[in-house]
Amino acid sequence: MKILIIGDVHESDFWTEHVQKNKDSVEKIVFMGDYFDSFKKVSAQVAFENFKKILALRESLGNEKVIMLIGNHDFHYTKFCMGRYSGFSTTTFVLAGSSLDELVDNGTLVLSYEYDGYLFSHAGVSETWFKEMIGEDSSVEDINPLFKQSPRIVEFRNDERTTSQYGDNEHQSPIWIRPNALSENPYGDYHQIVGHTAFDFSNIDSDRVTMDNGKNLYFTDSNQHEAFILDTVTGESEILR
């Protein structure tokens, strides 16, 4: 299956061109989360309108084709989040907060998506976090139902076990963990596809590294707003520049 992957949007509409060009040649479109907090002085109204365009795309192409993951810059606008983090805008909270609450409640915004051994989430799923928060006897199919039931399982963890304020710790959730910690402690026997940590793909041809479980870790948060097409049969990922 071919999947169009749209990395962290951060209030931009860069995704529209990639979707328009590729929507008919792919089976799925996965948005990796972080729809808000651009840090580039985009007005909250423009940001919210752009987010609603993504929702309209999902309605137009179908809920099965368009997958919307949640990121940390979305979660902190919900009523479930106990903290506020970098980029937080009170105006965005007023405009979008209740909508985001509803989208979590109705399952539109999900924590993960899995297909044929490829596991998508905003930042990655660690073995440690999964066992602590989902359960040792659980499976990936349990992640989204439990998140919908108890959204605070993704809160940033700040205690004696999580010394990194950057989130580079195996106890952090799929909206917070960083690549180093994830690579050393990946959940299960899955390739993982993540956003969250930005990379410059302008001078490189590969968007992946190998994790400690021998599987690939694909990065999708591009400083230049590239998108990606993943072929789940071959494992190849095309960078759309």
Residue ranges and their predicted role:
Residues 175-238:
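Conserved beta-sheet core of the metallophosphoesterase superfamily
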Residues 6, 11-101:
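Core catalytic region of metal-dependent phosphoesterases/phosphodiesterases
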Residues 91-95, 109-186:
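Active-site-proximal loop/helix segment associated with metal-binding centers of metalloenzymes
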Residues 79-83, 131-134, 206:
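Short aromatic-enriched loop/helix-cap "lid" or pocket-rim segments at secondary-structure transitions
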Residues 22-25, 62, 114, 183-189:
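Flexible, charged surface loops at secondary-structure boundaries
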Residues 5-7, 29-34, 68-72, 120-121, ...:
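Active-site neighborhood of phospho(di)ester-bond hydrolases with catalytic His/Asp-centered motifs
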Residues 73-86, 106-124:
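Internal, conserved structured core segments that host functional sites
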Residues 10-14, 37-39, 73-79, 126-128, ...:
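Active-site environment of divalent metal-dependent phosphoester hydrolases
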